[in-house]
Amino acid sequence: MKKQLIAVSKKLITLILGIILIINLPIQQSLAASPEDLQELQQLLETQLVRSYQQAVEDAVDARIDEIDNSLWSITLDNTDLIWQKVDGKPQVLMVTWTSWDGYDDKIGEKMQLTREVWTTPVPQLQTFISQFNLNEDNLTLRLEQYLGLPPENGKTKFVQMWVEPKDLFRPCPDPEIIDTSCSLKFPSNVEPQYQEWVNEKILTSYGKNGYPWTRLGYTYDWGSITTEIGASEYVVRVGAEVEIDSVINTIEYVQ
């Protein structure tokens, strides 16, 4: 996915311009500038963030074999990083999704049948990642958006943790199995035609002007890092899956 030098340079410029935000340093302490100059700088930073995100979307169109990550979180009982429970003898793994939808709020502790696909990451991967930063609320939200491959000011307000049976999860890549630590760029021979259609349709609709940097490699595109594009391991909960809502927590409380 890495683009040519000029695109990489633009990304570096974006990150340099955004360093004041990312390291949580007040602009007033960083620059000797008038209020008008500071406002102009803020507008420039916001513009550059949008450009950086769009470059990530364009970059993600081309998924290459050298970008395969061999350390994805596998959804297996022997993965001690995961959190499990058993209900009626069936194992369920704790997953989390970032959302602004209020439909989960009154379902805590209850079972719920999903009427849409829900994109999730395994608990506690996201919390472990964000704990290395000391950011104020605005910068923390931005870093989460970057890590999860979402556009800036995306409007997510809460994290919803849910218990999910592994059979209801798949990786959003040509190789949907969840029990290994990497994704193949090719469809396995046993993948159903309907799933191939799902992937191909997502490819056609994911990379436009208002698109998302879907890697198709089992991880989110971290467009805020200068060292790696690899974000969180991502999984989709199937439509019709019955899950148990564990908690609904606002963004700042969840990650602090």
Provide a role label for each language-model segment.
Residues M1-S9:
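N-terminal secretory signal peptides that target proteins for export/translocation
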Residues I13-N24:
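Bacterial N-terminal signal peptides
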Residues I27-A32:
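Sec/Tat signal peptide C-region and signal peptidase I cleavage site
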Residues A33-W119:
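ADP-ribose/NAD+-binding catalytic cleft of ART/PARP-like enzymes
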Residues Q92, W101-Y104, Q125-T128, L169-R171:
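Primarily extracytoplasmic ectodomains and periplasmic/lumenal surface modules that are beta-strand-rich
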Residues T99-S100, W119-Q125, L148, W163-D168:
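Short, flexible loop/turn elements at secondary-structure junctions
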Residues P124-T141:
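Short active-site loop/helix that positions an aromatic residue
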Residues E145-Q256:
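Conserved NAD+-utilizing ADP-ribose enzyme module
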